[in-house]
Swiss-Prot record:
The gene is Katnip. Disruption phenotype: Knockout mice frequently display brain-specific defects, resulting in a noncommunicating (obstructive) hydrocephalus. The keyword Cytoplasm applies. It comes from Mus musculus. This is Katanin-interacting protein. InterPro entries: KATNIP, KATNIP_dom.
Amino acid sequence: MDGQALRKVERSRSCSQERKEGYSKDMVTDFDEKHDEYLILLQQRNRILKHLKAKDPVQLRLEHLEQGFSVYVNGANSELKTSPRKAVHTDFSRSASQAEGSQDYGRRTLFREAEEVLRRSSRTAPGKVQRRGWHQKSVQIRTEAGSRLHIEPPLDCSEDFESQEDVIGKHEDATGEHTQELRKGLGLSTSLQTQEDGSSDEYDSIEEDVLSETETEDPVLPVHNRDECPLPSHDAVQKDVPKDQELEGRHPQATDTLVVMEFNPASKGNKMDRILSAKRKENAEVFIPSKPDSVLNPQPPAVFPEQERACSRSGSRRDRPLSATRKAYAAEDREEDASAVLKAIQVENEALQQVFLSHDPELHTSPQQDTKEPPAKSWSSLLKAKEDIPELLPATPVTTDPELCRAAAGAKAVSQAMDGMSPLGSRQQHKLVGVLQTMESDTTHLSQVAIPTEKPVPNSEEKWKARVDEIEDAIYVTMEILSNWGNASWVGLTEVQFFDLNNIKLYVSPHDVDIRNAVLPGELGCLVNRDLVSKKDPPVWTCPFHPPLQLYFIIHNMRQLRDFGLTMIKVRNYWTADGDLDIGAKNVKLYVNKSLIFDGVLEKGGGEAPSDCTIPVDLQRERNESSDKALSTGWKESKGALKMAALSDARELGLSCSQPAESLDMTVSSQGDFLGEKVNSTSGLKNSLSKLQEDVRLLATPASMGDGPSVPSSSSPGKCLPLEEEPSLIQQLESLRGRKIPEPTGKTPHWLQPSLAGMGKKQTVRKPKPLWLSPEKDLEQKSRFPSEDVMGDTPGEVETREKGPRREQGRTSSWNVITEERAPKAFSKACGDDLDIFSQLPNRDRPASGRRALKKEASSSHGDDRPASKEDTQASQTLPWLQWYGEQEHALHASWDSLTAFDRAHRGRISALEPQGDILDEFLKQQRSSRHEEFPAPCREEEPEPSTEMGGDSDFKIPVLPYGQHLVIDIKSTWGDRHYVGLNGIEIFSSSGEPVQISSITADPPDINILPAYGKDPRVVSNLIDGVNRTQDDMHVWLAPFTPGMTHTISIEFTHPCQVALIRIWNYNKSRIHSFRGVKDITMLLDTQCIFEGEIAKASGTLMGAPEHFGDTILFTMDEDILEAIFCLDDTFDMDAESLCGLQPEEALRRPSTADGEGQDERPFTQAGLGAQDQVPGLELQTSPPVSEVTTPEPGIFYGLCLRLNLTASWGDLHYIGLTGLEVVGKDGEALPIQPHQLSASPRDLNDLPEYNDDSRTLDKLIDGMNITTEDEHMWLIPFSPGLDHVVMIHFDRAQSIAGLRLWNYNKSPEDTYRGVKIAHVSLDGLCVSPAEGFLIRKGPGNCHFDFAQEILFGDYLQTRLPPAPTRRLDAKSLERASMDYEAPLMPCGFIFQFQLLSSWGDPYYIGLTGLELYDEHGERIPLSQNNIAAFPDSVNALEGVCGDVRTPDKLIDQVNDTSDGRHMWLAPILPGLVNRVYVIFDLPTTVSMIKLWNYTKTPQRGVKEFGLLVDDLLVYNGILAMVSHLVGGILPTCEPTVPHHTILFAEDTDFCHQEKHAIISKPEEDQDIQMMNENQVITTSRRKPGTADPALRPKTCIREKETSRRWRC
């Protein structure tokens, strides 16, 4: 027992020991396996984390784009983007987990832990708060899972967990690998949204997320002082600096390879513009912010910027670790960074100092006491306009401290610049460097131009002598009124005229007249631009009198004549028929260009006309007058005010006037200002000013910015133009307006920049430029401002000419922003405007322009004859800074230059360049008169000379009722067409009110038939008096070739001499584009007396509108009795209001050509419309005399045995010809019996052809009796050979009396009707009974709507037919067919007149008419019978179940039209898919001159509304027939009411027109189909017609014949 127990115990111990050993072995094995498995899982976890942290190229590029930002992802816009930016990370973890095996719970746990770490790290940023005052200390935050995390700032302040080596390597990748990509993507971008698109939609979403989440404020980063210890993490980064500096010479952050991007600070919730500072290029354009931003003072950060720059993604980016957001190299800028930036700035400053130290030493001696404002404001303005940054330091004396400017070396400047840059943040440093780079590029242009300024400046006396021989641009006349003839409060004048050396009156623009010392200026334009064409006398100039009153006149040399001058001034004193003549001026002084030429008394007005005072001008005295007399007391008195105005102007612009020349001149525009212009310093200006105050004779050449010694090759081309060369458009405008149109201020394009070699050679060998690219004329000779000499040369007080409400603000050019040539006279305009504003503000009504035109214009120029004050100089120097605000001005002027260049190279045929009401009107008007004077017509001497009262000044007064017999109209110009001139008509009325009888009318040139390509054009001069004036028909207009400079006259001879009371000119009105061929400037002579000279209004080109829309009416009397008599006899006003409202435009026959030909002077071809002589010859065959060789006792009846028909022509088919039926009409009108054996034909039928065997269209079908058909089994068809005979023979058994033929033409289908017979020659027993040209056979209709048989009676051709009388174009008057939509042929001629009735006035089931009448060419009504009228559907009897209705088509011609009885009307059903038709059929071609229609009266809604008229299937008219209104019966019950008829008029006969003028159909407004759509979806639909009516709902109607009782008619 015990032994067994022991053995059991031992056995159990051994087993347990074995189990323990096995267990321990199992434990060791299990631990090893678990450990290995753990290591494997850990390795997989690390791999997953590493893969998740890996960045694709898109992320890497985005991080490089974000470098330099401070991005807050959970700011105001953190939740705007909720879609995941990239789902690849979470998907990857899921896919990786599945790859390792979804059954492994531990691995999935590791994957979730890895993702949880990443998720937690993306949510550690605070919420939506402004991180302005973060403190660098430890914080505790609760994660989303609930645990707390203790966060401390790392020692190295790194933003990620990567080693410095990784940072170095990836920084090298960033700076080297992606440099070109960054340049390409951001070099010229102005916002992040314009970056280069990514390679996938994923990148687009990333970019949008960045844009939406980075809207919050980015505080300025401070630069650490030198005593601060840099962080260790900078060491690795700093190693990259020498490499970059070897390449670029600057710190990497200041180089071209690194793009700095930054958001502007937000201000009170307002979003700010994003601005990119990209790589600087040589000719980069100045960036202009898209909208102004306010500059705020950002709060400096209190902690390291890592916390500020660390951006945690929003919920859409949870899969991205925080460390991957951006790899910033350091927490803040180290001393090495700042020193590198300062070193780069030092390089910029040294380059600038070398440029300016090479100039005259006077540049650096400007005293500091001249500074009116601290330099900080100017620098802020400079950089704000350049980059719109938050704010710069209070003072940045890099280039603004005068001590730096005086230093010969740059050491002190560099040290002070470094001290001034130290408070700046890195971004501000980058931006300042960018500004300096732009300034350097500008300075490069300055240095190229400023070299010639070292030449000695000639004194003003030499320049004055040089100007004497040059072209004088303008003459300045001053009139000083000292007293009047007795009126206590008013003074006035009638007119002032100026005459040149050839005794020709000079044109003076109303805008070139100004006044001084007057509260109300009055209508100054009346002094020089009196409108003598108006019906009443124009107003006379008056104004309140406060002596001395000064009037200023500027007379421009528009033609650039060298002998430009005045010989005489004519002054007409105040005079009105019923006015106070004491208002006239008495004691007057007159100055011409500083010279007193008159000091005396003007005669008082009296009698029937104002008195003239002619004042001669002493030319020698005027030209030799010294400039010493230029200074006036007015200039001295206004000097102080001008200083104040200029200073206020500069302050208004927000620019400082204290910068020395370096800071101002380096931003001068380089496009138009460096073409031969010089830039001097402000210091030189001040020295010159001190001399000018001692010696006023040097006023003409102060050494200011611009008019120093210029390069001869550059300035000389701009002095004057040859006489034979036309000045450019801009130069002509400058001459007219008296002001300089500036050059654009942007960078000069590389194709316009002068080469460096050329600049080094002082520009003496520069290739000449085209005229439109040449430098503008010198301001002193070319565009002297209207107020220059006035201000300096006239006695008394002086003020600018631009004064009063008459000067439109809109005419002030906004191009005057730039002081384009920096000339000394770039100041008078400024002072003039400012003095005008400040001293006369209550008297002006000048609105402030939104573009600040007044302020910009105020600094454009100064006059020669006044010294420039210091404030004025500074104000003018500040204007180059406006180029940053003037980008649109650049584009505007560039467009103008392009148009000018195009105008030089391409001359269009129609050059209507005159916007009415603009100053261009005056300019072009003067140009026309100048051209006509320069090129007098050689034939002008043969014309009768005007009366002597015209004189040389072309001045006249419209006479009252001029008397004469021979009227000559001299056409000076057209409305733009340079090749043709035309008119529609001329109407002349005498003093008795009757139209003047005209015996003859001629023209020179007569018409366009004198040209080689013409000969029968209907547009002849006799059309002018045919009475058809409101027209677009070529048959009623006159057109002649026009050659500028030649004579174009119209001569009209009256039957008897008479007094002319009214002349109406109807201008050329063919179309809107052709209306430019109308006359514009004309002169009228009646028996050599000028009765009119002026402009005729251009026609509208349509047929709508009042008579004034078609030309002009000239009245020669205001007598009411005469005008009333004219009104009664004037057909123009004899139209009722309905007809006027119904005028519709007519379509042109063909579109005019608008393209230029090969030669600019080639005259384009013009062609008239289809006239009466162009009708189809076949339609006029009835006019030929009959050719009949058979004479019988009974006219028209022929007796014979054998009848022969020869078919010689078809209606168009070249291969077949045929007929449907044939009958021979006997003596009694009955058809003669014909048997098949009596018929023979050659060819017999189609079976004669080899390809036909058993064709059914045989000869016997002609007499089978089935004639009204469209089945060809009942027709005859044979092959047709043009030119050969196709004969049908009928052999009667015995001789028959034959009166004619009855034919049914081939009618298989509308297309096959062209196989029908057109011409048939008929002979009987060998004798011809048809005309020589044969009988004209009517073409078949192609349907069976009516019996289309044609009866040819031989007797109708026996009478000799006279051709229709020619239209009397000299005395016939008619009204234009107002309702036509096209050019209708005159009096259409044809066989079948078809009325297509398209719609009714509302009834969907029935349509009807009461009656119709047709009139022939003689105005006689054409008798119609039942054989002539047909309709389809025929009547209501066509309906099922309706019969016996009396409203059949024959009721249309029963001549009972004025009735409401339905038994005399026609009514037909409207059937679905069919158009109701009414046919009027003639057997002979019939000419119709007029058609009268009576609409359906019984039920007006069943009347015809829309209809069309076709003549032989050709549409000749369409319109709308008015509905019959309520009819009023007569006094007696038996009296029928009068039903109004409607007329379609084709004739021009006077009787027709006057008789039917109130019945002509006028086209009212039509209903239209309207669809309103929104985003391609139909919203509403309005249709003019209801849907197809249901035939089942058709109402029954029927009127049967009944015995009529006796009815009385009255």
